[in-house]
Amino acid sequence: MTNLRKTHPLMKIINNSFIDLPAPSNISSWWNFGSLLGICLILQILTGLFLAMHYTSDTMTAFSSVTHICRDVNYGWLIRYLHANGASMFFICLFLHVGRGLYYGSYMFMETWNIGVILLFAVMATAFMGYVLPWGQMSFWGATVITNLLSAIPYIGTDLVEWIWGGFSVDKATLTRFFAFHFILPFVIAALAGVHLLFLHETGSNNPSGLTSDSDKIPFHPYYTIKDILGALILILVLTSLVLFSPDLLGDPDNYIPANPLNTPPHIKPEWYFLFAYAILRSIPNKLGGVLALVFSILVLALMPLLHTSKQRSMMFRPISQCLFWLLVADLFTLTWIGGQPVEHPFIIIGQLASILYFMLILVLMPIASLAENNLLKW
């Protein structure tokens, strides 16, 4: 009799995805982040569910309900900080996952990559709306500033912003709908992640060399299941250390002040994982131009397959492209730092130069370097 694992309609799907899946024999730890993102998503949905049991999405009680969760609910403080810092871990894994894709040319799997870009936008939208829910000063003013950006859209902008707000300012209607969307989006993300995997399994995984690995495949289980478990243990170790020793390290102290529409904080800034995009937004003096640059800073990822001019897929054997890739990483760190600084000299000019370099590297320098490498290899 055939193994039930291979015949049962449900078990068969799991088997073909996580057990008998043929995987390249040489994929490194950079390929661990897909499973880590899955763990992060499950953790966020579970902790979020338990938080939603005690949270109230009303402007009068939202801040108090979060305080109540931390003070009165059994292990409420743990659930709340796991959720808040879990978001940070989620984004760390996301950035590393995308960086891996850029370095090793994984974007050549067009469908998988494009769904990944949509997933990135969805996670960013979810995180933004989640940050509004505790209804602290940064929640309120962050929501006001970011939603206001839509008013830069010609003709329909103002109406669009008021439609999203559900009034003439960020208020009760805004908070309620943000809670509703923040609750539903992770399930949409989970469904999209399933489609992401579906398309990945149509082609099989890429590998560090960028060469086809059809001649050398190994089963996913036990080789990569045990490797993923190690990755998961490290993720859990880092997250629990963060939550138990310095839960507010990555947060903003201003969010412990209840939202007050009459008092603007001196420096409005988003969570650390949005700072690079925020720096690009602020570096353009024009409102519409800034919004377009902000959107394009992420959307440019969708152009990566079109900008690939090299005859090789991976950067493993391309030293010039490697240098430019790490320059891009350094540039993103610079943008993240600038995004958290006040708008004054010398931060303004540093941010503008870093923003120009960001787009120059992706759109101009890296494609040229790839062509140069082709010529150097006489290809």
Curated annotation (Swiss-Prot):
Binding site for a ubiquinone: H201
Amino acids binding heme b b566: H97, H196
Subcellular location: Mitochondrion inner membrane
Membrane topology listed for this record: Multi-pass membrane protein
Segment forming the signal sequence: none
Gene Ontology biological-process annotations: mitochondrial electron transport, ubiquinol to cytochrome c
Binding site for heme b b562: H83, H182
Bilayer-crossing regions: 33-53, 77-98, 113-133, 178-198, 226-246, 288-308, 320-340, 347-367
Any one annotated GO CC term: mitochondrial inner membrane
Primary subcellular site in the record, as a coarse category: mitochondrion
Matches recorded under CDD domains: cytochrome_b_C, Cytochrome_b_N
Cofactor(s) the protein requires to work: heme b
Cofactor note: Binds 2 heme b groups non-covalently.
Keywords linked to the UniProt accession: Electron transport, Heme, Iron, Membrane, Metal-binding, Mitochondrion, Mitochondrion inner membrane, Respiratory chain, Transmembrane, Transmembrane helix, Transport, Ubiquinone
Presence of the UniProt keyword Repressor in the record: no
An example Gene Ontology molecular-function term: ubiquinol-cytochrome-c reductase activity
Function: Component of the ubiquinol-cytochrome c reductase complex (complex III or cytochrome b-c1 complex) that is part of the mitochondrial respiratory chain. The b-c1 complex mediates electron transfer from ubiquinol to cytochrome c. Contributes to the generation of a proton gradient across the mitochondrial membrane that is then used for ATP synthesis.
Subunit structure: The cytochrome bc1 complex contains 11 subunits: 3 respiratory subunits (MT-CYB, CYC1 and UQCRFS1), 2 core proteins (UQCRC1 and UQCRC2) and 6 low-molecular weight proteins (UQCRH/QCR6, UQCRB/QCR7, UQCRQ/QCR8, UQCR10/QCR9, UQCR11/QCR10 and a cleavage product of UQCRFS1). This cytochrome bc1 complex then forms a dimer.
Additional information: Heme 1 (or BL or b562) is low-potential and absorbs at about 562 nm, and heme 2 (or BH or b566) is high-potential and absorbs at about 566 nm.
Family, as annotated: Belongs to the cytochrome b family.
Name by which UniProt lists this protein: Cytochrome b
Gene: MT-CYB
